[in-house]
């Protein structure tokens, strides 16, 4: 329970004004206001705008803006370099393709000129030493072989042995045949050693050399003497252009009485009296047993 003194003192305290209290209040208000300003202020390095833009104009902001600018500049330069490299590569490829095409056309033109016969033997010898021209040499040889084959087979094809029935037929066969045709005439008589072997060889070679005309005639038909028949048969006469270019009498002296087609072929090739063949000898030439079989008959006209 309060006394009268307390009440009196209390009322005085309520209405009592102290200068120290006012100063304390002012200090508190200032501190409170300073704290509010500090809380509302933004950091020095804060960015409030988009990428590459800073509202901070302080030293750190300027440095960051410069770094970002240099980074963008470097990226742009690298992209330009890559684009330039792609363009250069594309242009180089297109130029190379065009140049390669022109070079190939030039090579083909040179090749055709050389193959057409504009190359001398000296040029051919030089190219044989140059491995880089191997492709040309292969094509050249191939075309030359084809040309020789056409020259060999462009005339008539015979492929059999012709029997000459008379002396007049013998002369006509020599004089009226094409001048480029090679004619081989076997003069024979039955019972002469080596006659049967020669007949079989002629049959085989006629199939192997269709451009060569193989014939046979009895010595009695052309009026040969008995001495010639006994001592010179079997004989082989070779004509070309109406002239006698080969004359082999008593062939058995060189080949023996039992010889084969391959033996006669090698003998004639040794003297250059058979054209070169494009292909190897077929089995029918090498297999003399087939050519000399008793069941096979000569194709005689």
Curated annotation (Swiss-Prot):
Domain Phosducin per the UniProt entry, residue ranges: 37-299
InterPro entries cross-referenced by the UniProt entry: Phosducin, Phosducin-like_reg, Phosducin_N_dom_sf, Phosducin_thioredoxin-like_dom, Thioredoxin-like_sf
Region (Thioredoxin fold): 158-301
KW Acetylation (keyword) present: yes
Pfam families given in the database record: Phosducin (PF02114)
Biological processes per GO annotation: cell projection organization; heterotrimeric G-protein complex assembly; positive regulation of smoothened signaling pathway; regulation of G protein-coupled receptor signaling pathway; visual perception
Keywords: Acetylation, Cell projection, Chaperone, Cilium biogenesis/degradation, Phosphoprotein, Sensory transduction, Vision
Phosphoserine sites (modified residues): 20, 25, 226, 293, 296
PTM sites of type N-acetylthreonine: 2
Main location group: other
Region entry Disordered, spans: 15-53
One cellular-component annotation, GO: cilium
Subcellular location: Cell projection, Cilium
Similarity annotation: Belongs to the phosducin family.
Entry function: Functions as a co-chaperone for CCT in the assembly of heterotrimeric G protein complexes, facilitates the assembly of both Gbeta-Ggamma and RGS-Gbeta5 heterodimers. Also acts as a positive regulator of hedgehog signaling and regulates ciliary function.
Quaternary structure note: Forms a complex with the beta and gamma subunits of the GTP-binding protein, transducin. Interacts with the CCT chaperonin complex.
Annotated protein name in UniProt: Phosducin-like protein
UniProt organism field: Bos taurus (Bovine)
Higher taxonomy: Eukaryota, Metazoa, Chordata, Craniata, Vertebrata
